[in-house]
């Protein structure tokens, strides 16, 4: 069984993330979207909220699960008995960083492969940071995030 892990902070999940999730889920038996608990970041959404948003976005998918993790990614991948890490790339600048991480992961866990997936051209500019900045200032985020969570993102800034 091919088990893939797609890690990220997903703060919030965007249509770019969803594009990678949908495409990756078609080439594996099971895809775990792994939401990183990163103590050094100050996320807009709590880990519970990010997991909940992702579950809402992938509702109805039969081979996708959402989990959170902390610590080393390779340890989580081993724990899940997965064999591939999926990484989405938007631009050359993403590749430089992700290549270094893939090589480090390979050093730590030689049996785990990293598969790079280019973002669809429609989302090659998109990041969670950009979505948050737009939403913070009342910009239009429709088409950038899954429609089913758009209101929750906008409402998050109304509470601040």
UniProtKB/Swiss-Prot annotation:
Pathway as given in its UniProt record: Cofactor biosynthesis; coenzyme A biosynthesis; CoA from (R)-pantothenate: step 4/5
A Pfam family reported for this protein in Swiss-Prot or TrEMBL: CTP_transf_like
E.C. number(s) listed in UniProt: 2.7.7.3
Catalytic activities: (R)-4'-phosphopantetheine + ATP + H(+) = 3'-dephospho-CoA + diphosphate
Binding site for ATP: 9-10, 17, 88-90, 98, 123-129
Location(s) in or outside the cell: Cytoplasm
Named cofactor requirement(s): Mg(2+)
Binding site for substrate: 9, 41, 73, 87
Keyword Magnesium: yes
GO biological process: coenzyme A biosynthetic process
Keywords: ATP-binding, Coenzyme A biosynthesis, Cytoplasm, Magnesium, Nucleotide-binding, Nucleotidyltransferase, Transferase
Major subcellular site: cytoplasm
Swiss-Prot/TrEMBL site (Transition state stabilizer) positions: 17
GO molecular function, one term: ATP binding
CDD domains per UniProt: PPAT
NCBIfam families: coaD_prev_kdtB, cyt_tran_rel
Family: Belongs to the bacterial CoaD family.
Role of this protein: Reversibly transfers an adenylyl group from ATP to 4'-phosphopantetheine, yielding dephospho-CoA (dPCoA) and pyrophosphate.
Known partners and oligomeric status: Homohexamer.
Protein name, entry field: Phosphopantetheine adenylyltransferase
Gene: coaD
């Amino acid at each position: 069984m091919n088990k893939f892990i797609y890690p990220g902070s997903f703060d919030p999940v965007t249509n770019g993330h969803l594009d990678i999730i949908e495409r990756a889920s078609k080439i594996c038996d099971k895809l775990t979207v792994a939401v990183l608990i990163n103590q050094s970041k100050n996320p807009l959404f709590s880990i519970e909220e990010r997991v909940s948003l992702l579950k809402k976005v992938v509702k109805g998918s039969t081979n996708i699960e959402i989990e959170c993790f902390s610590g080393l990614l390779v340890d989580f991948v081993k724990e899940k008995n997965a064999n591939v890490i999926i990484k989405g790339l938007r631009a050359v600048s993403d590749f430089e960083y992700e290549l270094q991480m893939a090589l480090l992961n390979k050093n730590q866990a030689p049996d785990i492969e990293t598969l790079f997936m280019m973002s669809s051209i429609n989302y090659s500019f998109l990041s969670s940071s950009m979505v948050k900045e737009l939403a913070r200032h009342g910009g239009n985020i429709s088409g950038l995030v899954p429609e089913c969570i758009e209101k929750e993102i906008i409402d998050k800034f109304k509470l601040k």
